[in-house]
């Protein structure tokens, strides 16, 4: 008789920028109380005032990359890295190891949880697919991505497009997904897809 404990379900949630990943995580947390580990949250912690990584960023780009309170000017940094692949790679080389340590620490504390969701926008780009047991990709139309970035982040169309094209093409992520969530419609259209994916083990 097989007495091995059931394998922990680790859902890797990813997708293009501004496709609606946070909508999915919010819904799962509210409906199923699933623990959420968020790479974006860890990345923000990595550059908090006084951190070694923020010091390195200021050393590379100058003190004008910080505001008067010593906080990172995210918009200014974005203008640099989303238009320069080499600088983007350098920044990720600083932040990704910190994010990885945060994930490992959090997962070690959640071993008793049946399911954990890891929200990782750069799941494929950072080669973290081995961390998860299944991959969910959130998708929508490219024009919707642009419009959401303009509205949410206050970007110009050119800036929005630069951020989208700096990432792995969404179609390639979809091809590698176990589950595809189409968020090109309303939340009422998305919810049944999330429920179906949740119950499909």
Swiss-Prot record:
CDD domains xref list: DPCK
Major subcellular site: cytoplasm
Major enzyme class: transferase
A molecular function (GO) term: dephospho-CoA kinase activity
Entry keywords, A to Z: ATP-binding, Coenzyme A biosynthesis, Cytoplasm, Kinase, Nucleotide-binding, Transferase
Subcellular location: Cytoplasm
SUPFAM superfamilies attached to this UniProt entry: P-loop containing nucleoside triphosphate hydrolases (SSF52540)
Residues annotated to bind ATP: 18-23
Limits of the DPCK domain: 10-201
EC number: 2.7.1.24
Function: Catalyzes the phosphorylation of the 3'-hydroxyl group of dephosphocoenzyme A to form coenzyme A.
Protein name: Dephospho-CoA kinase
């Amino acid at each position: 008789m097989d007495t091995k404990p059931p394998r922990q379900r680790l859902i890797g949630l990813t997708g293009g920028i501004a496709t609606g990943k946070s909508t999915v995580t919010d819904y799962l947390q509210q409906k199923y109380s699933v623990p959420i580990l968020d790479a974006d949250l860890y990345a923000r912690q990595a550059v908090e005032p006084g951190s070694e990584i923020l010091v390195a960023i200021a050393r590379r780009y100058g003190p004008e990359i910080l505001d008067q309170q010593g906080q990172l000017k995210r918009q200014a940094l974005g203008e640099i890295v989303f238009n320069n692949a080499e600088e983007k790679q350098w920044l990720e080389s600083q932040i990704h190891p910190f994010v990885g340590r945060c994930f490992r620490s959090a997962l070690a504390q959640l071993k008793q949880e049946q399911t954990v969701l890891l929200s990782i926008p750069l799941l494929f780009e950072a080669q973290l697919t081995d961390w998860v047991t299944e991959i969910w990709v959130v998708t929508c139309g490219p024009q919707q991505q642009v419009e959401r970035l303009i509205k949410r982040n206050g970007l110009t169309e050119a800036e929005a497009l630069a951020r989208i094209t700096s990432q792995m093409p969404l179609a390639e992520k979809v091809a590698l997904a176990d589950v595809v969530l189409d968020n090109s419609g309303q939340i009422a259209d998305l919810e049944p897809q999330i429920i179906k994916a949740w119950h499909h083990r």
